[in-house]
Amino acid sequence: MSQNDLIKTIRMNYLFDFYQALLTKKQRNYLELFYLQDYSLSEIANTFDVSRQAVYDNIRRTGDLVEDYEEKLGLYRNFEQRQNLYEQIKQHINDPEQIKKYIQALEDLD
C-alpha cells in the first residue's frame, strides 16, 4: 500500500465515522468492509453475490458522497482543527497567555 493509499484510507475511515448515519445500509456495508475490514473488491462481491464492478462503482460513488458531505458540513475538518489546538495547548501548558489564545480559537470553531 502506497503512502497516498494509506492517507486516503485513514481519511475515509474518519469520514465514515462522521457520516455513516447518512448512508444506506448497503453503502455502510461496502465502505466498512473495504476501508475498515480491508476486504478486497472480490471478497465483497462474493459476500453480496454481485460483480466486482458493482462493488467498485458503489464504493467510488459512496466515497464521493462522503467527501461531498465533508465539503458541506466540515465535521472532519473541525475535528482536525480541534486536535491541532489541543496539541498546541499541551505544548504551551506553562504559558497562560498562549493557553487563552488557543481556548479562544477552540471557542471560535463553535
From Swiss-Prot:
A Pfam family cross-referenced in the UniProt record is UPF0122
What this chain does, per the entry, is described as: Might take part in the signal recognition particle (SRP) pathway. This is inferred from the conservation of its genetic proximity to ftsY/ffh. May be a regulatory protein.
- Give the protein family: Belongs to the UPF0122 family.
Kindly list any coiled-coil regions of this protein: none
Q: What is this protein called?
A: UPF0122 protein SSP1533
Q: Which InterPro entries match?
A: RNA_pol_sigma_r3/r4-like, UPF0122, UPF0122_fam_protein, WH-like_DNA-bd_sf
